[in-house]
Amino acid sequence: MTTSLQDGQSAAGRAGAQDSPLAVQVCRVAQGKGDAQDPAQVPGLHALSPASDATLRGAIDRRKMKDLDVLEKPPIPNPFPELCCSPLTSVLSAGLFPRANSRKKQVIKVYSEDETSRALEVPSDITARDVCQLLILKNHYVDDNSWTLFEHLSHIGLERTVEDHELPTEVLSHWGVEEDNKLYLRKNYAKYEFFKNPMYFFPEHMVSFAAEMNGDRSPTQILQVFLSSSTYPEIHGFLHAKEQGKKSWKKAYFFLRRSGLYFSTKGTSKEPRHLQLFSEFSTSHVYMSLAGKKKHGAPTPYGFCLKPNKAGGPRDLKMLCAEEEQSRTCWVTAIRLLKDGMQLYQNYMHPYQGRSACNSQSMSPMRSVSENSLVAMDFSGEKSRVIDNPTEALSVAVEEGLAWRKKGCLRLGNHGSPSAPSQSSAVNMALHRSQPWFHHRISRDEAQRLIIRQGPVDGVFLVRDSQSNPRTFVLSMSHGQKIKHYQIIPVEDDGELFHTLDDGHTKFTDLIQLVEFYQLNRGVLPCKLKHYCARMAV
């Protein structure tokens, strides 16, 4: 180390020796060379005074001692010598000392049914499921695994479910700059319903299974066939297709296979020479048409569309139209399973796995939604007891609800409120409007659209004002993928006003009692009321 420093200084001295012999002599004195001349004998220094000569010698001695002191200090030992010589140094350093979080963030805006919105700054690799969970926690909603993000393309009237494993930031990257597109958050009860009741979504006249599945087919067997990577059932039926670049529609017989969607050029023949490829699915998504008749001139309101992922114009759309809602649901569900079947099944079975934005603790729901974790309790006696009989538990729950409302009415009556029918109806109206399933003044068509958007599975319902009969109500519900409407008739008994669905055989003092009764009992309805349609703010 000392030698290299001296060599460097000697080299520097030699480089400047041609121009300045004085610099060479001073450098030798500073380095303590034995052959250095006396400063008095060096040309150019003979004019220095003795005082100046002594000062120069002292400065040179101090410089010499300082250099020697620096050179003699031992180097600081390296506490991790193996990291300096290891070929894996960079890998270990990156693992042991990670850099600051470099995940890119992006702002996305999510809308609700009432058009309120919330802007979120999220990592670019966050999934749609994580975005739903963040909004659920922020708004203190109960997570029942039905909350869903929807991609809404306003300018062409299309909408689709953003699957739980998809990245919303990628969805936004496919939008055009000037397009008025939105992400909506709402419930979709039909999102994974086909895993529970596959035959409900795939009617026998539209599905052809392999020969080995002839005979009785259990839901488990049907599900295994749809999730199989080697075979896939053939979906077939008539559809209306919009001709490319034209406004006209043409009816043809279509076949859905693993290789794509085909139509027959000769009736219902499925011979290879008669089949022509209509679209494949590797670079496209399936959308529901919201206003097919108005925007695209569709012959029926049950339209859907195959749209490429890239931003494009209406010419890139593959517009289709079914004869009924059940047929459209079958086609759309089959295409979803064909594209992401096993991934959708994993999303359904393990909704809280694979989070990218937060850990499992911060993303856990604030309230448990598992019915198995709740027990019915009876506190009427001196000691509380668990009610084991389910029938008794339901009856106790109904009785407590009725008693609560009765006490509330008595409190209102004691304060001089409702003896008059008009005052009583005003109180009931205030109670009804506080319920999430009550939608007040919406039309029949709007009620149908709302139920379809939130998944037309059996038992999805809402209550609204009747447009044809003032001061009465209508129960709108879905069953068999059809929307049905039931008039809630007001009846009077002993001067009191009641509500009924069965001509007075079962009477209720308000709509809350009516809804709770039919949530527990089928009665005159085709099925029990299971899921209510609500417009939640984000």
Swiss-Prot record:
Any one Pfam family match given in the protein's UniProt record, by short name: PH
SUPFAM superfamilies cross-referenced by the UniProt entry: PH domain-like, SH2 domain, Ubiquitin-like
MF term (GO), any: protein-macromolecule adaptor activity
Residue list for modification Phosphoserine: 370, 373
GO annotations of cellular component type: endosome membrane; plasma membrane
Keywords of the record: Acetylation, Cytoplasm, Endosome, Membrane, Phosphoprotein, SH2 domain
Protein name: Growth factor receptor-bound protein 14
Taxonomic path: Eukaryota, Metazoa, Chordata, Craniata, Vertebrata
